[in-house]
Amino acid sequence: MSSFGYRTLTVALFALICCPGSDEKVFEVHVRPKKLAVEPKASLEVNCSTTCNQPEVGGLETSLDKILLDEQAQWKHYLVSNISHDTVLQCHFTCSGKQESMNSNVSVYQPPRQVILTLQPTLVAVGKSFTIECRVPTVEPLDSLTLFLFRGNETLHNQTFGKAAPALQEATATFNSTADREDGHRNFSCLAVLDLISRGGNIFQEHSAPKMLEIYEPVSDSQMVIIVTVVSVLLSLFVTSVLLCFIFGQHLRQQRMGTYGVRAAWRRLPQAFRP
């Protein structure tokens, strides 16, 4: 055997002795579901499995309550209960001394069950501003929530919320608008959409009850002057007609009763109507 062949054989034997697992297949760990959104205090069934034929050890790591429902050599089925907050479940298996793991992300949500719309003020003059406010109590996660404000079928405003927003607070969206003549015939409403598709959940929607504005035309200064003048003239005519009727009545009475009767009537006349 040549020296080159001898060296090649030596290297091959060394590799077999020092690296016995170099040809060993890499195994995988799977978890079902990979992600899911649940309501508070819910329970969830989780399946952990592996491609390793004879795993040495395996299981599910979580701080929540768990029960092993069933198992075989390559899989374990658990019930996780009392889920009250977002959490990560970790499935793991060890095969030939090597450990692999896979995580399942669980999100806790509360859907929008009540959407409250407020118009302030409800009586608005044409051209004046008013505020539309939408409130949704106790909804989470807020970063998956969007509030839409509508005037009829027109979207006036949409409001999203960042991840930094605290959970289980009241979500609020406001929008300032200017009233026009047609607003008195339009419905205002709010739509809350909680989109949990990216978290392994569904889309939840809730509408507010529709509200309407009372719209009126503002009175200009010149119109106000005309109204005040007309009212003053009418009031003066009314007072004058009352005085004329009184004087005419007393004149007729004087003709019937004489001077004495007129003087007596004059004394009975209130001071306000005397010249």
From Swiss-Prot:
GO BP annotations, alphabetical order: cell adhesion; cell-cell adhesion
Cytoplasmic topology ranges: 249-275
GO molecular function, one term: integrin binding
Keyword Ribosomal protein among record annotations: no
Chain positions carrying an annotated carbohydrate: N47, N82, N105, N153, N158, N176, N187
Keywords: Cell adhesion, Cell projection, Disulfide bond, Glycoprotein, Immunoglobulin domain, Membrane, Repeat, Signal, Transmembrane, Transmembrane helix
One Pfam family this sequence matches: ICAM_N
Signal peptide (residue range): 1-24
Residue segments, region Required for interaction with EZR, MSN and RDX and co-localization to microvilli: 251-275
An example Gene Ontology CC term for this record: microvillus
Annotated transmembrane regions: 224-248
Cysteine pairings via disulfide bonds: C48-C91, C52-C95, C134-C190
Subcellular location as annotated: Membrane; Cell projection, Microvillus
Family: Belongs to the immunoglobulin superfamily. ICAM family.
Protein task: ICAM proteins are ligands for the leukocyte adhesion protein LFA-1 (integrin alpha-L/beta-2). ICAM2 may play a role in lymphocyte recirculation by blocking LFA-1-dependent cell adhesion. It mediates adhesive interactions important for antigen-specific immune response, NK-cell mediated clearance, lymphocyte recirculation, and other cellular interactions important for immune response and surveillance.
Assembly description: Interacts with RDX, EZR and MSN.
Name the record gives this protein: Intercellular adhesion molecule 2
Native source species: Gorilla gorilla gorilla
